[in-house]
A protein has these predicted regions:
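N-terminal active-site segment of His-dependent metallophosphoesterases
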Residues: 1-60
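A generic secondary-structure signal
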Residues: 34-42, 68-72, 165
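Extended active-site neighborhood of metal-dependent phosphoesterases/phosphodiesterases
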Residues: 60, 65-164
Length: 167
């Protein structure tokens, strides 16, 4: 869960949320920076696959910041494939002082455009309803990126249509 520092990570409302929802929001930037630095320095790593949830709750600001970090990986020569999930859209909020406030969210419909440079643009098969996709990650090797979230079914569920698509 990448959380942009501007969505807040302190105050009474934040502390209350953390009692039941521990996502390391305050530390996520440093964690991503450290992990990506290690991946960049690892000359054997050619392909990086990052399954969602990519952001805390789909805050557009968090997606934009995370994408900047992904470009650093890509510029180092790594091939990157992400798969979005349920926390990447809807239910966006932030913390300011001691309050939980609304934050600009990311519509489900634009996620694949945001992450086009990180797998979705290379899809050889794509399920528009769930954003699941197939991509050839290297010669002769295909990745099936399954997202079991959509606007038309409960988050975290796969229906018969989705299973048939995956086959």
């Amino acid at each position: 869960y990448y959380a942009n520092e501007r969505i807040g990570s302190s105050g009474e409302a934040y502390d209350i949320k953390c009692q039941v929802d521990q996502k390391c929001m305050a530390e996520s930037g440093a964690i991503i920076d450290s992990a990506f630095k290690s991946i960049i320095e690892d000359k054997e790593t050619e392909i990086v696959i990052i399954p969602g949830d990519l952001t805390k709750n789909g805050e557009l600001e968090s997606h934009k910041s995370f994408i900047k970090e992904l470009y650093k990986l890509k510029e180092s020569g790594k091939k990157i494939f992400v798969i979005t999930a349920g926390h990447d859209y809807g239910n966006s909020f932030a913390f300011k002082n001691d309050e939980r406030i609304e934050a600009e969210g990311t519509p489900f419909e634009i996620l694949t455009e945001l992450y086009k440079a990180f797998g979705y643009g290379e899809a050889i098969a794509f399920d528009e309803a769930t954003h699941s996709y197939v991509a050839e990650i290297t010669d002769g090797v295909r990745m099936l990126g399954i997202c079991c979230d959509s606007l038309n079914q409960p988050k975290g569920a796969m229906d018969e249509r989705h299973l048939a698509w995956a086959k």
